[in-house]
Swiss-Prot record:
Source organism per UniProt: Homo sapiens
Glycyl lysine isopeptide (Lys-Gly) (interchain with G-Cter in ubiquitin) crosslink location in chain: K212
Gene3D superfamilies: 2.60.40.640
Modified residues (Phosphoserine): S361
Alphabetical list of PANTHER family matching this protein: ARRESTIN DOMAIN CONTAINING PROTEIN (PTHR11188), THIOREDOXIN-INTERACTING PROTEIN (PTHR11188:SF14)
Gene behind this protein: TXNIP
Protein function: May act as an oxidative stress mediator by inhibiting thioredoxin activity or by limiting its bioavailability. Interacts with COPS5 and restores COPS5-induced suppression of CDKN1B stability, blocking the COPS5-mediated translocation of CDKN1B from the nucleus to the cytoplasm. Functions as a transcriptional repressor, possibly by acting as a bridge molecule between transcription factors and corepressor complexes, and over-expression will induce G0/G1 cell cycle arrest. Required for the maturation of natural killer cells. Acts as a suppressor of tumor cell growth.
Subcellular location: Cytoplasm; Nucleus
Example GO molecular function: ubiquitin protein ligase binding
Sequence similarity: Belongs to the arrestin family.
InterPro entries in alphabetical order: Arrestin-like_C, Arrestin-like_N, Arrestin_C-like, Arrestin_domain-protein, Ig_E-set
UniProt keyword annotations, A-Z: Cell cycle, Cytoplasm, Disulfide bond, Isopeptide bond, Nucleus, Phosphoprotein, Transcription, Transcription regulation, Tumor suppressor, Ubl conjugation
Lineage of the organism: Eukaryota, Metazoa, Chordata, Craniata, Vertebrata
Name by which UniProt lists this protein: Thioredoxin-interacting protein
Entry PTM: Ubiquitinated; undergoes heterotypic 'Lys-48'-/'Lys-63'-branched polyubiquitination catalyzed by ITCH and UBR5 resulting in proteasomal degradation. Deubiquitinated by USP5, leading to TXNIP stabilization.
SMART domains on file: Arrestin_C (SM01017)
Length: 391
């Protein structure tokens, strides 16, 4: 029977636990070991990995794929480590043994740390404690990586525009048309930026329509020749009803980019893409949808501070209000931010339906609900008695 010697503590600690790393940066830390009794240690090893994984079931078939960004292995040594026979470290209770490590992330594109429904991109350091006649003990610590996306390139600073027209019919009888044209000042944005929307809407059909806009994320997973797409509605804004025979315009209508992860475009098995959808809800017919692609960048360097001022002229928000940190902040997990009722599979159209079931684009005009004025403030003190006492 093998008796297992108890280890008091065995953990990986990074020198900067809150840091978000980029390509080419050094990851440094130490492995800390404490024992409850005299213990012989053969070796302390580390394995650092960065892997993208996708996995889902397609009927009875398992679709699975991995892509590796980082792999680093090393055997660690103590500074002035005491050694016994066979070059083993003799650890004693009451002492803390620290093994330092450090390695550099690869240059070039790296997948941003991400966790989705059918896949993830994870980075971690795993430490192994090898002892004679004992099972190898393991401990693991994750760290965050962001692939820096520069939104100040000419391609991402260029305006994006589109237009679309849809003929509407009722019982196969033509009923006019609905047209939409829209433009945004640039394609690349960062968290906290305001997207300034310029759009024109025309309604010549007999129905009342409603213009809206939404930022939508698309997660694309690829494995074994199969593709899985998950669509998420992140934020939205709407305009006023457009009655028959009238037009409407948006001149700098703002939609803020919330706290979301940067776009992941360089991974061959997992992509995170964003779009600004400008659409018109037409009762009894399909929506008229414009899809303007977006690229969400990481917050670093100049970010989009100077190049997105044109899209901020219609907003009252200042850069002081954004409270930008000096170092990039770890992006949140999508599954923690997005409400469950907005996590829908493709296609996009059901995603754009309102969740509250309200009649915001009725065929007939509805009168607003009548509401009584609220009652006056109640008090148990009689003002007449107070006046008599004063006199």
């Amino acid at each position: 029977m093998v008796m297992f010697k108890k280890i008091k503590s065995f953990e990986v600690v990074f020198n900067d636990p809150e840091k978000v790393y980029g390509s080419g940066e050094k990851v440094a830390g130490r492995v800390i070991v404490e024992v409850c009794e005299v213990t012989r240690v053969k070796a302390v090893r580390i394995l650092a990995c960065g892997v993208a994984k996708v996995l889902w079931m397609q009927g009875s078939q398992q679709c699975k794929q991995t892509s590796e960004y980082l792999r680093y292995e090393d055997t660690l040594l103590l500074e002035d480590q005491p050694t016994g026979e066979n070059e083993m470290v003799i650890m004693r209770p009451g002492n803390k043994y620290e093994y330092k490590f450090g390695f550099e992330l690869p240059q070039g594109p790296l997948g941003t740390s991400f966790k989705g429904k059918y896949g993830c991109v994870d980075y971690w350091v795993k430490a192994f404690l090898d002892r004679p006649s004992q099972p190898t003990q393991e401990t693991k610590k994750n760290f965050e990586v962001v692939d820096l996306v520069d939104v100040n390139t000419p391609d991402l600073m260029a305006p994006v525009s589109a237009k679309k027209e849809k003929k509407v019919s009722c019982m196969f009888i033509p009923d006019g048309r609905v047209s939409v044209s829209a433009r945004i000042d640039r394609k690349g944005f960062c968290e906290g930026d305001e997207i300034s929307i310029h759009a024109d809407f025309e309604n010549t059909c007999s129905r009342i329509v409603v213009p809206k806009a939404a930022i939508v994320a698309r997660h694309t997973y690829l494995a074994n020749g199969q593709t899985k797409v998950l669509t998420q509605k992140l934020s939205s804004v709407r305009g006023n009803h457009i009655i028959s025979g009238t037009c409407a315009s948006w001149r700098g209508k703002s939609l803020r980019v919330q706290k979301i992860r940067p776009s992941i475009l360089g991974c061959n098995i997992l992509r995170v893409e964003y779009s600004l959808l400008i659409y018109v809800s037409v009762p009894g017919s399909k929506k008229v949808i414009l899809d303007l692609p977006l690229v969400i960048g990481s917050r670093s360097g100049l970010s989009s501070r100077t190049s997105s001022m044109a899209s901020r002229t219609s907003s009252e928000m200042s850069w002081v209000d954004l409270n930008i940190p000096d170092t990039p902040e770890a992006p949140p997990c999508y599954m923690d931010v997005i409400p469950e009722d907005h996590r829908l599979e493709s296609p996009t159209t059901p995603l754009l339906d309102d969740m509250d079931g309200s009649q915001d684009s009725p065929i007939f005009m509805y009168a607003p609900e009548f509401k009584f004025m609220p009652p006056p403030t109640y008090t148990e003190v009689d003002p007449c008695i107070l006046n008599n006492n004063v006199q």
